[in-house]
């Protein structure tokens, strides 16, 4: 039996479902939402983002708030390998793993010399199996961006979605899922597990799981 991690998709979006404006502005989270994000990070074994999130936000993906400051493994998924080794995620602890379908890139050896683990992948399900078998990842948090979230949802490789609705309207920009979309009845159904008004009083945090018939 193929074993894979339990996958939690976490995101904060505007009322109209955007992760960022068309210019890349993405400051949506209140301090309480940021703390919630870091607490979830501390409870998982790995946190994953796409390459564009690394290029635009330059995140460290470490745990800064909460009682448990244990940092998860950081995972970056890229097809092009258009990444700079000076980004925070590659120059600070803990370990970072890059999964790429462009393993022949001349940059691979440069990243390996800096201590970054680089793995070749063609399909997300193979990537998840590798994380489970070789990195002991049992719980994985996927933080974006929109293309990566779409791949997970399209391939039905998620277990839970935790989403915070921020009181902003962007009108255009990066959607929660950036992909070709579903057609009618093939779109997945979700079951609402929990709904909370944020401590700030102006945001709502929702937890969904896949609807089980």
Curated annotation (Swiss-Prot):
Keywords (A to Z) from UniProt: NADP, Oxidoreductase, Riboflavin biosynthesis
Sample GO molecular function, one term: 5-amino-6-(5-phosphoribosylamino)uracil reductase activity
EC number assigned by the record: 1.1.1.302
Reactions catalysed, as given in the entry: 2,5-diamino-6-(1-D-ribitylamino)pyrimidin-4(3H)-one 5'-phosphate + NADP(+) = 2,5-diamino-6-(1-D-ribosylamino)pyrimidin-4(3H)-one 5'-phosphate + NADPH + H(+); 2,5-diamino-6-(1-D-ribitylamino)pyrimidin-4(3H)-one 5'-phosphate + NAD(+) = 2,5-diamino-6-(1-D-ribosylamino)pyrimidin-4(3H)-one 5'-phosphate + NADH + H(+)
Residue numbers binding NADP(+): 53, 57, 79-82, 122, 145-148
Source organism, top-level taxon: Archaea
InterPro entries reported in the protein's UniProt record: DHFR-like_dom_sf, Rib_reduct_arc, RibD_C, RibDG_C, Riboflavin_Biosynth_HTPR
BP GO annotations: riboflavin biosynthetic process
Pathway terms, separated by semicolons: Cofactor biosynthesis; riboflavin biosynthesis
Sequence similarity: Belongs to the HTP reductase family.
Subunit structure of this chain's protein: Homodimer.
UniProt function note: Catalyzes an early step in riboflavin biosynthesis, the NADPH-dependent reduction of the ribose side chain of 2,5-diamino-6-ribosylamino-4(3H)-pyrimidinone 5'-phosphate, yielding 2,5-diamino-6-ribitylamino-4(3H)-pyrimidinone 5'-phosphate.
Name listed for the protein in its UniProt record: 2,5-diamino-6-ribosylamino-4(3H)-pyrimidinone 5'-phosphate reductase
Protein's organism: Saccharolobus solfataricus (strain ATCC 35092 / DSM 1617 / JCM 11322 / P2) (Sulfolobus solfataricus)
């Amino acid at each position: 039996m193929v074993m894979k991690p339990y996958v939690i998709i976490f995101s904060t979006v505007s009322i109209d479902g955007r992760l960022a404006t068309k210019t890349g502005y993405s400051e949506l989270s209140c301090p309480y939402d940021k703390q919630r994000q870091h607490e979830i990070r501390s409870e998982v074994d790995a946190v994953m983002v796409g390459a564009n999130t690394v290029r635009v936000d330059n995140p460290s993906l470490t745990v800064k708030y909460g009682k448990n400051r244990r940092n998860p493994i950081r995972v970056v998924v890229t097809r092009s390998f258009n990444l700079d080794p000076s980004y925070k995620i590659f120059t600070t602890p803990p370990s970072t793993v890059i999964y790429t379908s462009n393993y022949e890139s001349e940059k691979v050896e440069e990243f390996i010399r800096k201590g970054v683990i680089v793995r070749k992948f063609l399909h997300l399900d193979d990537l998840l199996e590798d994380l489970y078998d070789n990195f002991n990842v049992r719980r994985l948090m996927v933080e974006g961006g929109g293309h990566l979230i779409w791949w997970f949802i399209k391939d039905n490789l998620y277990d839970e979605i935790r989403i915070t609705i921020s009181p902003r309207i962007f009108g255009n920009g990066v959607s929660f899922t950036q992909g070709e979309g579903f057609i009618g009845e093939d779109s997945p159904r979700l079951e609402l597990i929990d709904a909370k008004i944020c401590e700030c009083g102006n945001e709502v945090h929702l937890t969904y799981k896949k609807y089980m018939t």
